């Protein structure tokens, strides 16, 4: 094997091997251990003596403070501060001498630092009691930020300052409650589910079709044209105002069709209110909302499935 091949082969690192300890080195280590023990014991005794001295100084300071507090507070407040400063100064000198850093004790009369924390702006309305004359004061609202303003008034009127988040949110809810309370309330408008039954093997009857059209405030012809277009079939209305649909359909399928019809032709896309009206203008249908007065055009319903008749025979020339 050549020299170049020996260099490429992995070789153990000799520095990582453990060296054998001689007898002389073992004796030296024992002597060093004894010296370290003696040094540590001396250091421990010094620290105990220093701790006792510090405790004695603290007791003397406490006695001086108690004696000074017994006299007038105004005259002796400066003397107390001097004693505290002297004690802190002595501790700093001792810490520097020993090479140890000690934390300074905060005085009880130090200025309190104000910590800012993010808090949610919640409004707490407080109603005032009526006065002796019988006139009740105006309702004031206080927020967690400390802002106070009278209900029904604009606090930034006549000023050039920026709006506050709490003021704007309060104004939004106040206007909604005054103009459209249905949007704030948790009440939900409910509608009866469709009552679907089968008649024979090829027909499905929707029993409460006329009732659902009344709750949606839409014409019967407009609704069943949409139903036939979505289901891809046709049908008619019998004498009991029931919708007869050709084919076999489940209740879940009818419910999906009703939801699509409500989202497209009943519900307002701005305020989600069902209080809307369909108006026709120049062959186009417009959905007008009575709550927010918005207006949008809706798609024309395509016709449902139509039966294909026989083609007329071509004329022979």
Swiss-Prot record:
Residues 1-146 are annotated as: Disordered. It is found in: Cytoplasm, Cytosol. The keyword Kinase does not apply. Residues 79-90 have a biased composition (Basic and acidic residues). One of its GO terms (biological process) is formation of translation preinitiation complex. Pfam families: eIF-5_eIF-2B (PF01873). One of its GO terms (cellular component) is cytosol. It comes from the Eukaryota. SUPFAM superfamilies: Translation initiation factor 2 beta, aIF2beta, N-terminal domain, Zinc-binding domain of translation initiation factor 2 beta. InterPro entries: IF2/IF5, Transl_init_fac_IF2/IF5_dom, Transl_init_fac_IF2/IF5_N, Transl_init_fac_IF2/IF5_Zn-bd. Keywords: Cytoplasm, Initiation factor, Metal-binding, Protein biosynthesis, Zinc, Zinc-finger. Transmembrane segments: none annotated. A zinc finger (C4-type) spans 222-246. The keyword Zinc-finger applies. GO terms for molecular function: mRNA binding; translation initiation factor activity; translation initiation factor binding; zinc ion binding. Residues 109-125 have a biased composition (Low complexity). PANTHER family: EUKARYOTIC TRANSLATION INITIATION FACTOR (PTHR23001), EUKARYOTIC TRANSLATION INITIATION FACTOR 2 SUBUNIT 2 (PTHR23001:SF3). Component of the eIF2 complex that functions in the early steps of protein synthesis by forming a ternary complex with GTP and initiator tRNA. This complex binds to a 40S ribosomal subunit, followed by mRNA binding to form a 43S pre-initiation complex (43S PIC). Junction of the 60S ribosomal subunit to form the 80S initiation complex is preceded by hydrolysis of the GTP bound to eIF2 and release of an eIF2-GDP binary complex. In order for eIF2 to recycle and catalyze another round of initiation, the GDP bound to eIF2 must exchange with GTP by way of a reaction catalyzed by eIF2B. Belongs to the eIF-2-beta/eIF-5 family. Eukaryotic translation initiation factor 2 eIF2 is a heterotrimeric complex composed of an alpha, a beta and a gamma subunit. This is Eukaryotic translation initiation factor 2 subunit 2. It comes from Dictyostelium discoideum (Social amoeba). The lineage of its organism: Eukaryota, Amoebozoa, Evosea, Eumycetozoa, Dictyostelia. The gene is eif2s2.
